[in-house]
Amino acid sequence: EILNKLDVALDIHSVPTEIHQTIGIADLKHLDFSRDVLKTDILLVDENFDRAGSVVSFVNRNGGIGLGVECGSHADDFASQNALQSILRLLVKMDMLDLNLDEQDKKTEIFRFFEEIFPETLNFHYLRSYQNFSELQPWEIFAQDWEKIYKNQTLAPKYLGIIMDKVILWDGMGFLFEKLS
């Protein structure tokens, strides 16, 4: 019930493993707002939050602005600072705090969700080791599940991201993204 009343939600996460990039998620229609608040290395955007069950998705579906940010590793002080800075930027952006943060502009790569990758069996595997947001050329084959092959079936490069290393049936193994900038 509380989520239905939110104008803005900032969902902050850290991860147990080492991470080299900060990642934000937002609705494409709030792109400028998101860039100002999150200042991440990578910003993932989508226009369709109908299916996802996250706080970010729920708030976006219900007319608010839902933002998510992966700040870094649990054990890294950088993650705590990044979370704090995201909160401060949000409060400044909403005119709830008068503070000069004196930050440098950050180059943010922006990717739009294109397609989720679903395994059919536990035999699903990537054909090589990929880094998050590896570029896939048109028609490039990147995974296999018994006889089924997974490839970039478009005429433009796509980017493989949020890569999972353990197969869980009915759950995604990653996403293909379009690079917007």
Q: At which residue positions do the language-model features occur?
A:
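Structured catalytic-domain cores with a bias toward divalent-metal coordination
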Residues: 1-181
